[in-house]
Curated annotation (Swiss-Prot):
One Pfam family linked to the record: Peptidase_M1
Cofactor(s) listed in the protein's UniProt record: Zn(2+)
Catalytic activities: an epoxide + H2O = an ethanediol
SMART domains on file: Leuk-A4-hydro_C
Provenance organism: Ajellomyces capsulatus (strain NAm1 / WU24)
EC number: 3.4.11.-, 3.3.2.10
Binding residues for Zn(2+): H306, H310, E329
Cofactor note: Binds 1 zinc ion per subunit.
Region of interest (Disordered), residue spans: 1-23
NCBIfam families: leuko_A4_hydro
UniProt-recorded name of the protein: Leucine aminopeptidase 2
Residues reported to bind a peptide: Q145, C146, Q147, P277, Y278, G279, G280, M281, E282
Keywords carried by this UniProt record: Cytoplasm, Hydrolase, Metal-binding, Metalloprotease, Nucleus, Protease, Zinc
Record function comment: Aminopeptidase that preferentially cleaves di- and tripeptides. Also has low epoxide hydrolase activity (in vitro). Can hydrolyze the epoxide leukotriene LTA(4) but it forms preferentially 5,6-dihydroxy-7,9,11,14-eicosatetraenoic acid rather than the cytokine leukotriene B(4) as the product compared to the homologous mammalian enzyme (in vitro).
Length: 623
């Protein structure tokens, strides 16, 4: 929330260009959702109730909410039937729901709006899985993914991170339900005839709509720490428990010390079916995580450190709009690496940052070094925030904070961290407020203040392309850089690879090695690529990070023996981190096969993933 007087809201335009709501006139403070999950019809039906506070004095004569592809049946204002109008659709933001008011509302007075609604088959936030798409193949499954602007396709709302509300969930389903609130233990049957139960949750900490989350299906739970549980398909529960129980509480204790203790009560992880498009989604109480975390070697759990860190950066202190997404993701990546340093040692933080720098360079190369989306603060007016999704806000944001840490010194920066998260707790802010808060905090420290005022903030915020590269500790990557060099010069040196080359390397070191190979000016030959896979056992790995990179190397080398396993991998996982680059690589090697594999699997992918892969393969024309 902007630090300003309430009266000024009526004259200030909203900070978020990706909402159609008039949230500068009214602000949601409490939302209650009552939904029936109808698996056979693949829709949600019910009502949503918003309590809104007036930010003007009798000025606004309408409430405008975001909505997208919804069937709206009825609207009540303060208990009385109201007219409403769905305005013409404005891509990519949906159809604004306009609710006229009989009279203006006095400053700080509240308004209750009750909307009867159902989702449609065009909903972009819901994914419905048939029993065949789940691991036990017994029951259907449903989950939500609302970030960035998809909550509006579940219910009308002020779909902006600049607004936060307390949420109550009352969800009727024939299968267990998980939501981004704390369970209220009075599960009741919907009716005497119904097999459904009503699952109730309460989220007492105000959250933005993109953190609204639900999942329902065949879900079982097990403890993974004193304040944590894992939820997963029953047949996967034990392996998920084993994967996460060694590190989750260690991560929590580490970040508790860096900022301040975790305030949400429980920290739990839901391992979703494989079509989930992200590594993780930081939904409060329950992180929604990709099954690629489960690598049977505990080496992909960095995702959990990242999503846990979101409990402070993003969920508690939030970017005011997606133009300032680095405030969520740059901070979270920075905190994730501080957790890893506390648990594994400082060199591991630098090792993770080196991997991140590689991802950043790839994003900048793909967009072009002058592209708007390679800036830290981006212009998203009229644009879809999903189109700007890349490693840039994560890694350029991390490097900015790492730069500030090195500029003023780690000890001083460490004192700012808890101050920042305390000052903006339960609020939303933009980059300019971040700048003013750090300058203000160090105003009495002449040395730090001089350093912070003398460097070029605008260059960091608005310059496209790569930032200055930090001086990373390369101790954990030197060994794999050396191995990559042997492969680079193999044809001249007669290098003969063997399994001993990779003995003792962790999965992330293999990933860095393969990343180095992938950027050779002269790619490996198909024969070399196949030899590497055979000698190092790469094709047999159960670690998705390793498989993803090995398949990219093989496709670039023209090694046709990796086409079939790549296609199988693409039919088994929907995480965009893997799916998008593999389709791009497959497209370069054999466009017909790439299109054939996509057409076969597109209904398996989440709508967000499906839409972005379509753009990668076909441009904006779709398939």
């Amino acid at each position: 929330m902007r630090r300003c007087t309430k009266n000024s809201r009526s004259t200030n335009p909203p900070r978020d260009p990706n909402t159609l709501s008039n949230y500068n006139a009214f602000r949601t403070t409490h939302t209650t959702v009552n939904f029936d999950i109808l698996f056979e019809k693949q829709k949600l039906t019910g009502n949503v109730m918003h309590k809104l506070i007036s930010l003007t004095n009798l000025e606004a004569r309408e409430v405008i909410l975001d909505s997208s592809f919804l069937n709206i049946h009825d609207v009540k204002v303060d208990g009385k039937q109201s007219k409403f109008e769905l305005l013409p659709r404005q891509e990519p933001y949906g159809s604004a729901l306009k609710i006229p008011l009989a009279e203006g509302v006095a400053l700080s007075k509240t308004l209750d709006i009750d909307i009867t609604v159902e989702t449609t088959e065009k909903c972009t936030a819901l994914q419905w899985l048939t029993p065949a798409q789940t691991s036990t193949q017994k029951h259907p499954y449903m989950f939500t993914q609302c970030q960035a602007i998809h909550a509006r396709s579940i219910f009308p709302c002020q779909d902006t991170p600049d607004v936060k509300a307390v949420i109550d969930f009352n969800i009727s389903s024939p299968l267990p339900v998980i939501a981004s609130g704390v369970p209220v233990n009075d599960v009741s049957s919907s009716s005497s005839k119904s097999k459904n139960k009503v699952y109730k949750f309460h989220q007492k900490v105000p959250i933005p709509t993109y953190l609204f989350a639900m999942a329902s299906g065949e879900i079982a739970e097990a403890p993974i720490g004193p304040r944590s549980r894992v939820a997963a398909s029953p047949d996967k529960l034990e392996e998920c428990k084993w994967e996460l129980e060694a590190d989750t509480e260690k991560f929590m204790q580490a970040i508790d010390k860096i900022i301040f203790p975790y305030i949400w009560g429980e920290y739990n992880v839901l391992i979703l079916p494989p079509s989930f498009p992200y590594g993780g989604m930081e939904n409060p109480i329950f992180t929604f995580a990709t099954p690629s975390v489960i690598s049977k070697d505990r080496q992909n759990v960095d995702v959990i450190a990242h999503e846990l860190a979101h409990s402070w950066s993003g969920n508690l202190v939030t970017n005011a709009s997606w133009e300032h997404f680095w405030l969520n993701e740059g901070w979270t990546t920075y905190l994730e690496r501080r957790i890893l340093a506390a648990v594994h040692g400082e060199p591991y933080r630098h090792f993770s940052a080196i991997i991140g720098w590689k991802a950043l360079t790839e994003s900048v190369e793909r967009y072009g070094k002058d592209h708007e989306f390679t800036k830290l603060v981006v212009d998203l007016k009229g644009k879809d925030p999903d189109d700007a999704f890349s490693s840039v806000p994560y890694e350029k944001g991390f490097n900015f904070l790492f730069y500030l840490e090195n500029l003023i010194g780690k000890d001083k920066f460490d004192k700012f961290i808890p101050h920042y998260f305390t000052k903006y707790k339960e609020a939303s802010l933009d980059s300019y407020e971040f700048k003013s808060s750090i300058l203000s905090f160090f105003s009495s420290d002449s040395e730090a203040h001089a350093l912070l005022t003398s460097f070029d903030w605008d260059k960091w915020f608005y310059s496209p392309g790569l930032p200055p590269k930090p001086d990373f500790d390369t101790s954990l990557v030197d060994i794999v850089y050396a191995l990559a060099q042997k492969w680079r010069t193999a044809s001249e040196s007669g290098f003969s690879p063997s399994a001993v080359d990779v003995n003792g390397l962790v999965a992330n070191q293999l990933v860095v090695f393969l990343e180095q190979v992938l950027v050779f000016e002269k790619p490996l030959s198909a024969e070399q690529s196949k030899l590497m896979g055979d000698k190092y056992g790469l094709a047999k790995s159960e670690n998705a990070e390793v498989l993803n990179m090995y398949f990219q190397v093989g496709l670039k080398a023209g090694d046709k023996s990796v086409i079939e396993p790549t296609a199988a991998f693409l039919s088994s996982i929907g995480r965009m981190k893997y799916v998008r680059p593999l389709y791009r690589a497959l497209d370069k090697l054999d466009r017909n096969i790439a299109i054939e594999v996509f057409e076969k699997n597109k209904s398996f992918y989440h709508p967000i993933c499906r839409g972005l892969v379509q753009k990668d393969l076909f441009g904006n024309k779709g398939s």
